């Protein structure tokens, strides 16, 4: 089973307000691995959609991640959760692609009083962690 820790217990309504469905960082990584290796139905199209340009919480504003680093991601935001997961394709100095999955999930038990402050603050946390991960991988894999 691809995502054994995922629980879909309610349909997602028209405006996306659902709070009881659950997944785990491990399941998001499993999804990314299967997607990268073309093991999901329509993997190529899913990767294309996830790579469409837009602001993300993984690379946008992360000072160590070079501009132009390919990112395929999906963000999610509610008054209880701010998240982003995806595949970043870094490059080594020799030009080799170095793909890696990253998942950032910040959850709050009670509804945030200021949605804007909640999302922007937690987005910065996810971005900071993504930047730290890139710096660690840069040293290990001789990334640009």
Where are the regions that the model predicts?
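Structured C-terminal helix/loop/strand segments within mature extracytoplasmic catalytic/sensor domains
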Residues: 31-70, 75-144
